[in-house]
């Protein structure tokens, strides 16, 4: 069982990143929060790892903080919530805002995550709300919405830029230097403006 992996960040793909360690490239699935925090290509990265065995493979899930990994594992204890749904929830908002939505029984934010319907959101609230009542939860974090949207769209924007002929390194640099606009179209436009000088 791995606790964390430290290696060289080799690039972002649609729903995972590649980290090289001792000549081996590890395919690591990540949340939007972690994708947003990735360094420049070929720089060092450290991710806290959760291994999940499948019928024919072992999938690795990586997070920048132990807190995010703990939340990922906690979400997966809920019936009907798997790894993909847990990553979706961690991609649409911050951990604090997710906890706040659960404690205040607000399903709106939870159902923004792909794969999470109203019934699943209600089940998450029912089973987890008591776990967070004593936590220091930040409620005044509406300004994170634009960052959350950026997290959701960054991988798609990267793919679009590379399909236009820009290298992965150029595309990632552009994404790190644009304003966190709300729509995917605006993010791509801002990246193109940056790349064209």
Curated annotation (Swiss-Prot):
Subcellular location: Cytoplasm
Cross-referenced InterPro entries: DNA_helicase_Holl-junc_RuvA_I, Hlx-hairpin-Hlx_DNA-bd_motif, NA-bd_OB-fold, RuvA, RuvA_2-like, RuvA_C, RuvA_C_sf
Region described as Domain I: spans on this chain: 1-64
Endoplasmic reticulum keyword on record: no
Name of one Pfam family that matches: RuvA_N
Top-rank taxon, per record: Bacteria
Domains as described in the record: Has three domains with a flexible linker between the domains II and III and assumes an 'L' shape. Domain III is highly mobile and contacts RuvB.
Keyword Signal recorded: no
Protein name according to UniProt: Holliday junction branch migration complex subunit RuvA
Disulfide bond entries: none
SMART domains (UniProt xref): HhH1 (SM00278)
Organism listed in the record: Clostridium tetani (strain Massachusetts / E88)
Segments of this protein annotated with the region Flexible linker: 144-154
């Amino acid at each position: 069982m791995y606790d964390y992996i430290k290696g060289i960040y080799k690039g972002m793909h649609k729903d995972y990143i590649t980290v090289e360690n001792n000549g081996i490239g590890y395919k690591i699935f990540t949340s939007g929060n972690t994708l947003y925090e990735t360094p420049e290509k070929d720089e060092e990265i450290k991710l806290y790892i959760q291994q999940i065995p499948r019928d024919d493979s072992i999938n690795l899930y990586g997070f920048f903080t132990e807190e995010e990994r703990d939340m990922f594992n906690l979400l997966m204890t809920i019936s009907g919530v798997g790894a993909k749904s847990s990553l979706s929830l961690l991609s649409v908002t911050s951990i604090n805002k997710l906890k706040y939505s659960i404690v205040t029984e607000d399903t709106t934010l939870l159902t923004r995550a792909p794969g999470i319907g109203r019934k699943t959101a209600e089940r998450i609230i029912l089973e987890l709300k008591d776990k967070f009542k004593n936590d220091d939860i930040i409620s005044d974090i509406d300004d994170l919405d634009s960052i959350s949207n950026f997290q959701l769209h960054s991988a798609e924007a990267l793919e679009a830029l590379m399909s236009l002929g820009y290298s992965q390194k150029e595309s990632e640099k552009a994404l790190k230097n644009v304003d966190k606009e709300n729509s995917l179209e605006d993010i791509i436009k801002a990246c193109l403006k940056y790349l064209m000088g």
